[in-house]
């Protein structure tokens, strides 16, 4: 959520050094083409705002703090600012933020210690199904708890530098470690709850950042989280990022999808 607040502040402040986006990968590398076929670029009109994850042909999962009045998505992209034959564009017919997410946090404000970013996820219903190809494939929800110490991969088009807002064209990937939540509790002022995951590199330098919100956290090959919030500047030592823990929400996700075919 801090990523979105900073993104909005930069946009409203007239920053023109880079196209406006939300959060981004620091310390990463260009993802191999088609290696993240579930990764979705979420737009408000023609402005990229967040990442997302394709769960099936009709549904995208993203962060609730990415909530805006209108959405459309691009699937199968590896380059944000270029046309690609593999890419598919879809409108979003309806959005479903988690009912327990505190939407008042969307008002721009300085993060406070009492802020609780729990339940930060949202489903987007596509107006027409995605075509499944080598570049566009869904990923399954988790069926068990993630293992501490797992190697996790995060991806996104968020800022590639921790302080100066700089967006990449190529989809970025970075490997980080799944850490005990106590590490994030100790090193963040905001609440870290049992519906969140703590992941990063304690030495710093590798992190999600401004523009990565809603993108996938894949640990040992399994989708376990989506990017939620983290430190500013991104990639600070001893301050891992915080992710929504999807195993806590699989029933809500499945029920919402089933009730809105």
UniProtKB/Swiss-Prot annotation:
InterPro entries in alphabetical order: Peptidase_S1_PA, Peptidase_S1_PA_chymotrypsin, Peptidase_S1A, Trypsin_dom, TRYPSIN_HIS, TRYPSIN_SER
Recall the GO molecular function terms of this protein's record: serine-type endopeptidase activity
Taken from the UniProt record, the cysteine pairs bridged by disulfide bonds within this chain are: 31-173, 50-66, 152-219, 184-198, 209-234
Alphabetical list of Pfam families matching this protein: Trypsin (PF00089)
List of catalytic residues = 65 (charge relay system), 120 (charge relay system), 213 (charge relay system)
Describe its function: Glandular kallikreins cleave Met-Lys and Arg-Ser bonds in kininogen to release Lys-bradykinin.
Name this protein carries in UniProt: Kallikrein 1-related peptidase b11
Per the UniProt record, the source organism is Mus musculus
Q: What is the lineage of its organism?
A: Eukaryota, Metazoa, Chordata, Craniata, Vertebrata
Gene name of the record: Klk1b11
């Amino acid at each position: 959520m801090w990523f979105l607040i900073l993104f909005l502040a930069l946009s409203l402040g007239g920053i023109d050094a880079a196209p406006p986006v939300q959060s981004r990968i620091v310390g990463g590398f260009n993802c191999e083409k088609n290696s993240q076929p579930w990764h979705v670029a979420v737009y408000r009109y023609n402005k990229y705002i967040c990442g997302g994850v394709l769960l099936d042909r009709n549904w995208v999962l993203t962060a609730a703090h990415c909530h805006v009045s209108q959405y459309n998505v691009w699937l199968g992209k590896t380059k944000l600012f270029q046309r690609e034959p593999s890419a598919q564009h879809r409108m979003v017919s309806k959005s479903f933020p988690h009912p327990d997410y505190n939407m008042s946090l969307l008002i721009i404000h300085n993060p406070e210690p009492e802020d609780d970013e729990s339940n930060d996820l949202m489903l987007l219903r596509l107006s027409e199904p995605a075509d499944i190809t080598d570049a566009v494939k869904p990923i399954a929800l988790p069926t068990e708890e993630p293992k501490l110490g797992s190697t996790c991969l995060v991806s996104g088009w968020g800022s590639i530098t921790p302080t100066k807002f700089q967006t990449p064209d190529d989809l970025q990937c970075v490997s980080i470690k799944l850490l005990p939540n106590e590490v994030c509790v100790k090193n963040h002022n905001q609440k870290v709850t049992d519906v969140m995951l703590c992941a990063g590199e304690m030495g710093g330098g590798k992190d999600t950042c401004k523009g990565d919100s809603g993108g996938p956290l894949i640990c040992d090959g399994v989708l376990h989280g989506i990017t939620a919030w983290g430190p500013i500047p991104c990639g600070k030592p001893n301050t891992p990022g915080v992710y929504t823990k999807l195993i806590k929400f699989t029933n809500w996700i499945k029920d919402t999808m089933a009730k809105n075919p």
